[in-house]
Design a protein with these regions (language model features):
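Aromatic (phenylalanine/tyrosine) cluster motif
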Residues: 19-21
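N-terminal secretory signal peptides that target proteins for export/translocation
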Residues: 1-16
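C-terminal motif of bacterial Sec signal peptides marking the signal peptidase cleavage site
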Residues: 31-32
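Active-site mouth of glycoside hydrolases
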Residues: 45-258
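Short strand-edge motifs at loop-to-beta-strand transitions and within beta-strands
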Residues: 452-454
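Short, low-complexity, disordered segments immediately C-terminal to signal peptides
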Residues: 37-42
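Extracellular glycoside hydrolase catalytic/binding regions
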Residues: 192, 197-343
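Aromatic- and carboxylate-lined catalytic core of secreted/periplasmic carbohydrate-active enzymes
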Residues: 66, 290-291, 300-445, 457-487
Length: 487
């Protein structure tokens, strides 16, 4: 049996009808809102730290076990800013719902080796000793981030082909440096370690990366998560699946802001990590950066939802002006492929995409989280052939079993789609649209007999949408009604 549902508008006083983030959300959910009433903001307490979930697919609060979706912002060259500027940056990221920032301790030669105060991160004949003055500044950044409910992902250094210093170290030196850095921040709950940026073949040998990774894990005594950032078009799983120090995988797709990079299938890297034998959480750490202030946010939304619905526990957004901290990055070759589009990094803090990406947290936290799996088999008709038209599906439950309580499908572009609702073990369903652009939830039917096959008509409004189909008896909250501790 196949039931067809055409999109329709419903009034606000209809049971479970139309709800749009706005002033009402700010009044009803003060605990999860900032002065921007439509912002879903991380709480200020990150003192519990993070650990890998028991099923090895997600990360959770280390004390409570509550799921944590990592929405990161890319700030490789954060050290180029002074502390008052950094506070401006961190405040903006928290207000826009990010809960993680990523930056590099030694970003030379892409940037100056010293930070804004003239301090290099590492000293000594081998540059394996931590500079007390530099780390006094870095400690202040970590504290400021914690005060705003932000995790910090600290990259020890970069190993890129033309833009890294990591290749100048021996394995023994890297292990010593990793051990020192790990020890310095051991148990600091909002610190996540990254062994290096673009630290995989063919830029650097696996043995050297394993050395610094093992040093970090040894130095922190296993109290912090440790990962590494691979070269483009790769996941860590290709090189480090057997490395005991690695807690979660990162992928890098195509980072340059050229339009052709938007066509790269980033979600395939994430999905590839889901079912390998060495199961670890996986996230998209670098994809096509934004440039300027007028780009269509659809490109960023598409990448986010496709990667997360493919099994990602997190996602990193990036803007060319913010990772460079324009105008502080000075290598001409970088500016050709990664054009900031603005004269100063502060102009890139509030793009349309930045205002929209955090809505995914409300959607994910309103449903059973740790049992969520990717499942393209529920898309029976309407699957697109590329990232611009794909329908990316996720649900909870067990693969190949009809034990779900919900399913979600991200529809990248207007199209007719047929979904297998038989995976939901319930006679009555609630079906609604969720807008990744506005955060609005629009209920289509709150008491739909489960047809097994559900046909969704093409939305006249166009753009991208998520359809959410649930066991009606579960009475899951619509995405804005969330507990304050959900982050």
């Amino acid at each position: 049996m196949k039931t067809s549902i055409a999109p329709r508008n419903v009034s606000a006083d209809t049971d479970c009808g139309l709800f749009v983030f706005g002033v009402l959300a700010g009044m009803l959910a003060l605990a999860s809102c900032s002065s921007r009433p439509d912002a879903f903001v991380a709480p200020s307490d990150v003192r519990d730290g993070l650990r890998v979930s028991d099923n090895h697919h997600y990360v959770v609060d280390a004390r409570t076990g509550a799921p944590v979706f990592v929405l990161a912002d890319t700030a490789w060259n954060l050290g180029a800013l002074k502390l008052d500027e950094i506070d401006t940056y961190l405040r903006s990221r928290a207000e826009h719902g990010f809960n993680t920032v990523m930056f590099v301790l030694n970003f030379a030669p892409q940037a100056q080796e010293n930070n804004a105060y003239g301090q290099p991160a590492y000293l000594g004949p081998d540059k394996t000793e931590l500079n007390p003055a530099y780390f006094e500044t870095c400690d202040a950044i970590v504290r400021k981030a914690a005060d705003r409910g932000l995790y910090v992902m600290l990259y020890a250094m970069w190993a890129g082909e033309k833009a890294g210093t990591m290749n100048g170290y021996t394995a023994a030196q890297l292990k010593a440096l990793g051990r020192a850095l790990g020890h310095h921040y051991a148990g600091v709950p909002n610190v996540i370690f990254c062994a290096g940026g673009e630290a995989s073949p063919h830029y650097i040998e696996v043995d050297r990366v394993n050395a610094i990774g093992a040093g970090l894990k040894e130095g922190c005594e296993g109290r912090n998560l440790v990962t590494v950032h691979p070269v483009a078009e790769n996941s860590d799983s290709r090189f480090y699946a057997a490395s005991p120090w690695l807690d979660f995988y990162m992928s890098q797709a195509k980072s340059g802001s050229a339009p052709k990079n938007a066509a790269y299938d980033a979600a395939a890297l994430v999905l590839g990590d889901w079912s390998i034998a060495a199961v670890k959480p996986t996230m998209m750490a670098e994809h096509r950066y934004e440039s300027g202030t007028r780009e269509d946010p659809l490109m960023q939304r598409r990448s986010l939802y496709q990667c997360v619905f493919a099994g990602g526990f997190g996602y990193a957004y990036g803007h060319d002006a913010l990772w460079q901290m324009t105008p502080h990055t000075g290598l001409p070759w970088m500016l050709k492929g990664w054009t900031p589009g603005v004269e100063n990094w502060t102009q890139a803090l509030d793009t349309p995409a930045v205002r929209q990406l955090h809505y995914i947290k409300a959607l994910l936290y309103s449903h059973p989280y740790l049992t969520r799996i990717p499942d393209q088999s529920v898309v029976l008709e309407g699957q697109g052939g590329d990232v611009f038209t794909r329908v990316q599906a996720t649900r909870d439950g067990t693969p190949v079993r009809n034990d779900a309580t919900y399913l979600m499908a991200y529809i990248s572009a207007p199209r007719n789609v047929v979904l297998n609702t038989g995976v939901i073990a319930a006679p009555i369903l609630r079906v609604y649209w969720f807008s990744p652009e506005t955060g609005a939830s629009e209920v289509i039917d709150g008491e739909l007999p489960n047809p097994g096959r559900l046909s969704l008509g093409e939305r006249a409004q166009g753009g991208d949408w998520i359809v959410v189909i649930e066991d009606a008896s579960r009475k899951f909250p619509l995405p804005h009604f969330l507990p304050a501790e959900g982050r």
